[in-house]
Amino acid sequence: MSLETLLQAALFLEWQAQQQQQRTREENDKILVEQEEEEEEEEEEENKSVLRTEEHINQLPPDPVAPPAPAPPPPPPPPPPPSAPVTVIPLPVVSCTPQPVVQTTVSPPVLQRHAPVVSPPVLNKEVSLPPVIQRPPSTVLPEIKTTPLNMGSPKPLHHYQAPVLAITHHHLMQQQQQQPIQPQPTSLQPQQQPHPQPLGALRLPVTDDGRSNEQRRRPGGAGTREVHNKLEKNRRAHLKECFETLKRNIPNVDDKKTSNLSVLRSALRYIQSLKRKEKEYEHEMERLAREKIATQQRLADLKNDLSQWMDIIEIDRIVRQTVQPEDDQASTSTASEGEDNIDEDMDDDRPVNALSKRQQPGLIKMIPSSAAVHNHHSTILPQHVSIQQKQVPSPHTQPQISSQALVPTQAMVPAQTHIVTASAVQSTVIAHTATTHASVIQTLNHVISGPQTKHIAHIAPSTSSPVQLTTAAQPIGHITVHPATINHMTHLGQQLPIYPQPVAVSQPMMSHIAHTISHPQVNGTTNLGQPAVMTKPTVGTQMVHHPQLVGQTVLNPVTMVTMPSFPVSTLKLA
């Protein structure tokens, strides 16, 4: 369970509890309102019942008084003596009775009424005649009846005391009505003693009405209580289910008896721990995002560096392809380094050189230099040239070697092969490849120019047109080829590239064209895809070993042939 779900569950529980409380409050309010309404209705009913009882009581007195009502018919005979002072005596009695009724409250008029009612008959008995005594009570009684009825009608009878007083008042009125009938005034005291008895008799029905109202309330109250209990039971069951679900969602909570308070506390602790973990995870995500951005920037920088390095490597590769001679010259910056390499080659090939020394007396001179002068304009170097050279241990096989080295057909030489010429005057020849720039050649011309005669053979960049190879006018006496160099050339044939393009060479005073010049102490290295044959159609190859010639042939890019007399330390190609 996630934090949000727990919070939502807690909020849902609180919301349900609030709704349940509101419902219970509303129900309680309704119950109270109903109870109040019932009480008001009961009070109204009680008031109505009291009024009814009062009306009933008011209606009851005329029945016992009704028999004396026919008494007035006998008074008509006395009217003949009007001159008697009968009329003067009842006036004060009538005038005295209404004044205390207006000034006093409900309770005192009872006592005051007793006094005037009691006093006038005494006066009447003392002063007036017996017939006169009977008339004033008849006149006084209706007045007394009217006053209490007028007094009792406007009162709002909310309490139980008021009707009791009214009832007592009515009883007093009845007693007063009975008093004038009796001729003795002393009968008031025995009549006042039974007064409390009718009060108790009247109170009993009022209490019976209250008990009946209470009995009527109980069924309604019991029904509302049952409904309330049912709702409370449902609410508690729902809360119990909610606490059970909360307990299941919280880890590390004992399944034993646990109170709801402990469950809520553990839930709060769990929520707080989840909040802390959430904050930690947020910080971790921010840190990882920063690291990701940093690694992306570093990766972009590395890609930029790699692209730059790739560009540099590509440029170097293109430069090497286009300007390989300059790189090779830079690698062989001085001729002295070349001489060191030559010395190493000499150490490796000493037995071959020893074998070649044995074959020096048996070398065959082929064609004189006059033949080379005659055919110097028609020399063509085809693409494919083969040289078959074998090492013979004994001098008896020298004719076979010379015959194998001679081929009457056209000489096939690769187009980019470096052609090296040497003169008898110990001249130096540097042959450059087709990719060499003119600036390098000019530098070589300036550097190599000296007192001695030196020859530079340059082959122009490879094109479809033939390129002329020119040398100095001084004739070259002979070109020597050592048989050990042929084997060395075949070993290096698979390592250096071959440029099979035809090149035409014109040499006015050139007697022989050779691919390698070897010395007993030096091995010249050259690269040929196929063995080269040292012959031309009209020019033979003179294989004479020259003891003082030191030569090195490099196919690509520079071939340097140095003589001991040339200051090689001054030559440096950049």
From Swiss-Prot:
Source organism, top-level taxon: Eukaryota
InterPro entries given in the database record: bHLH_dom, HLH_DNA-bd_sf
Tissue expression pattern: Expression in the CNS is localized anteriorly and in addition is present in the migrating neural crest cells.
Region (Disordered): 17-84, 171-233, 323-353
GO BP terms, alphabetized: regulation of transcription by RNA polymerase II
Biased amino acid composition, Low complexity: 174-194
Name assigned to this protein: Max-binding protein MNT
Residues covered by the bHLH domain: 223-274
Biased composition (Basic and acidic residues): 23-33, 47-57, 206-217
Pfam families referenced in this protein's UniProt entry, alphabetically: HLH
Keywords: DNA-binding, Nucleus, Repressor, Transcription, Transcription regulation
Alphabetical list of SUPFAM superfamilies matching this protein: Formin homology 2 domain (FH2 domain) (SSF101447), HLH, helix-loop-helix DNA-binding domain (SSF47459)
UniProt subcellular location: Nucleus
Job of this protein: Binds DNA as a heterodimer with MAX and represses transcription. Binds to the canonical E box sequence 5'-CACGTG-3' and, with higher affinity, to 5'-CACGCG-3'.
GO CC annotation: nucleus
Start-end of Pro residues biased regions: 61-84
Binding partners and assembly: Efficient DNA binding requires dimerization with another bHLH protein. Binds DNA as a homodimer or a heterodimer with MAX.
Compositionally skewed regions (Acidic residues) per UniProt: 34-46, 337-348
Chain segments carrying region Leucine-zipper: 274-302
A GO MF term: protein dimerization activity
Protein species of origin: Xenopus laevis
Gene name linked to the record: mnt
SMART domains in UniProt: HLH
